[in-house]
């Protein structure tokens, strides 16, 4: 038996979606509605056979959801909306409450909205997306899949900041971690490809895109991760600084009179690859500039790799060794240069790359005599979301989900 599951990612001015046939994971359609609220919004929808694109005014997310659902039947992808068996929603922040994906009910929604203080840019619109789909598909079960949930297995030594206790107890300031759905998916996919239980592996997963995070996975559980209270922390990213000396911030307030908003803009939108290179936040553009002799671009690439290498090294120490290293995300999946720079001179760990395999982004790119497996795995958060819908919302499908 097959089930049609929708995976939804609602952003502040966008709506990304996939419709999958489960448990096989076959993609029926995918698309994006962007620039919501503007007179020239764009709606893109594609199947394996066709692609549609339209520019039109879309006033709000309510219109976007209506447009999407009408297109599914209007384009013949579904004969009826009753064919949809479940909907999964990506939610940025689950706080300490959600240690797993959760069936959507009124209480779940209220908690997602309450947690908006921890993710003010994402949780409110995530909750709005859930409400709108519940209104249009009231009989269809829905599941909220939290980006933070996979990291709720961290020990206190990994998630607690050495601040006065009340800042954690009263304000919830601690490491939460993000990209959890991606790290969970690629580590599970690795174990499947190796034919080894994930519980038997020590893995470091590097999700490298415009946002970057590194995750240590031991015994099938996240034991450390580079992103913390916000997705701004950790390793260097496209426009985000990652970890810096915190005293730089009050120094800038005193020296340049910067406001909290200006500091946030500096750390989140003006730093990282863009800030160091002065060229771009796109790794490919910085690579091109470095190859043309731009010294700051070359330095940006080296700094990017060094921050990741240092994080990987600390996680290897924490886990007492390493069985496999995973690269995923736009940079991790497509940049042979990034992978080679991060993995250079690590023979003493039993980690070495095969240059030819790395250049063609093979699934496994380690040298033949290397002890540590190095894998390039395309992330698929939507498939992970659909699996969570199957597991939690469709009891009759649970056995199929486990075996898939």
Swiss-Prot record:
- Tell me what reaction this enzyme catalyses: propanoate + ATP = propanoyl phosphate + ADP
Q: Which Gene3D superfamilies match?
A: 3.30.420.40
Q: Which CDD domains match?
A: ASKHA_NBD_AcK_PK
Top-level lineage group: Bacteria
Q: Name one GO biological process term.
A: propionate catabolic process
Query: Which keywords does the record carry?
Result: ATP-binding, Cytoplasm, Kinase, Nucleotide-binding, Transferase
Against InterPro entries, the record matches this protein to: Ac/propionate_kinase, Aliphatic_acid_kin_short-chain, Aliphatic_acid_kinase_CS, ATPase_NBD, Propionate_kinase_PduW
A GO MF term: propionate kinase activity
Q: In which pathway does it act?
A: Polyol metabolism; 1,2-propanediol degradation
Task of the protein: Works with phosphate acetyltransferase (pta) to capture exogenous propionate and regenerate propionyl-CoA during degradation of 1,2-propanediol (1,2-PD).
Family to which this protein belongs: Belongs to the acetokinase family. PduW subfamily.
Which protein is depicted? Propionate kinase
| Protein species of origin | Klebsiella pneumoniae (strain 342)
| Gene that encodes the chain | pduW
């Amino acid at each position: 038996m097959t089930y049609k599951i929708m995976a939804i990612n609602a952003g502040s001015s966008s709506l990304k979606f996939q419709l999958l046939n489960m448990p096989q994971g076959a993609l029926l359609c995918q698309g994006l509605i962007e620039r919501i609220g503007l007179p020239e919004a764009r709606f893109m929808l594609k199947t394996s056979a066709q692609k549609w694109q339209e520019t039109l005014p879309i006033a709000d997310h309510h219109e976007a959801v209506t447009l999407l659902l009408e297109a599914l039947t209007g384009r013949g992808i579904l004969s009826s909306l009753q064919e949809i068996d479940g909907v999964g929603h990506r939610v940025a922040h689950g706080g300490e409450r959600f240690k797993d994906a959760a069936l959507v009910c009124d209480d779940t929604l209220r908690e997602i909205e309450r947690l908006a203080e921890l993710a003010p840019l994402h949780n409110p619109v995530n909750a709005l997306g859930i409400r709108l789909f519940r209104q249009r598909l009231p009989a269809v079960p829905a599941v909220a899949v939290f980006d933070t949930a996979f990291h709720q297995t961290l020990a206190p030594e990994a998630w607690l900041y050495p601040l006065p206790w009340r800042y954690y107890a009263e304000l919830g300031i601690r490491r939460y971690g993000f990209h959890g759905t991606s790290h969970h998916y690629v580590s599970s996919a690795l174990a499947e490809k190796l034919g080894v239980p994930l519980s038997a592996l020590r893995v470091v997963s590097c999700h490298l895109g415009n946002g970057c995070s590194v995750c240590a996975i031991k015994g099938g559980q996240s034991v450390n991760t580079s992103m913390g209270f916000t997705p701004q922390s950790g390793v260097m990213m496209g426009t985000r600084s990652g970890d810096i000396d915190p005293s730089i911030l009050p120094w800038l307030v005193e020296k340049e009179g910067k406001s909290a908003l200006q500091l946030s803009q500096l750390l989140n939108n003006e730093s990282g690859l863009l800030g160091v290179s002065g060229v771009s936040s796109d790794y490919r553009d910085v690579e091109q500039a470095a190859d043309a002799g731009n010294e700051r671009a070359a330095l940006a690439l080296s700094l990017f790799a060094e921050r990741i290498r240092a994080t990987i090294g600390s996680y290897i120490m924490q886990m007492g060794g390493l069985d496999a290293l995973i690269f995923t995300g736009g940079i991790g999946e497509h940049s042979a240069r990034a992978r080679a720079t991060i993995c250079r001179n690590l023979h003493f760990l039993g980690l070495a790359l095969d240059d030819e395999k790395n250049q063609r982004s093979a699934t496994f790119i380690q040298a033949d005599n290397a002890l540590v497996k190095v894998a390039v795995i395309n992330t698929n958060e939507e498939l992970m979301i659909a699996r969570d819908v199957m597991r939690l919302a469709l009891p009759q499908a649970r056995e199929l989900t486990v075996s898939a």
